[in-house]
Amino acid sequence: MLLQSPGDRAKTVIENDRVAVWDVSDPATALSFDAVVVSLSGGAAFLSKGATPSTAGRSMVINLKDHPSGPIANTTGYPLAFPRPGSRKILENEKVIVWDYTWSPGVATPMHFHDKDVVVVYLDDGELRSTSLDGNVVTNPFKFGMVTFNRGNRTHTETLVRGKQRAIITELK
């Protein structure tokens, strides 16, 4: 099935084999796939294929393509990325688990393993430093409304080194 266009008032921000993410400000057309709608005010909802998103303000529509990959076996000995201290599960079904998480300044998350691909919608302006098992350090600035897609099979810690940061994180099953 082809992905229906987001329309004139929406912008495609990510497109790959797993998802198509639309940045929308107005109600969109009926969905061609199941989707998670993440409001930039911090809420999230699951919508079934054929539904029409009802958005109040700016939202990200995460269209879930028919390409499940399933979780990757965790052989690292480290805990899974979620749940983690301070995280709150918003919803879970057979396709996704959606988490609300706020980083604390200067406090590293426990070293963890991502067994699933994730879509992250950032709700504040801040810089996160990621440190991998081999000691590789990468610092990335994330702004309000940014969206990223990260493949699973990663082990690292994260530390908020500047600003504030909260995100709605959608794990893809």
Task: Label every PLM stretch briefly.
Residues 27-49, 114-134:
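Glycine- and acidic-residue-biased ligand/ion/polar-headgroup-sensing regions
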Residues 84-134:
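Conserved small-residue-rich
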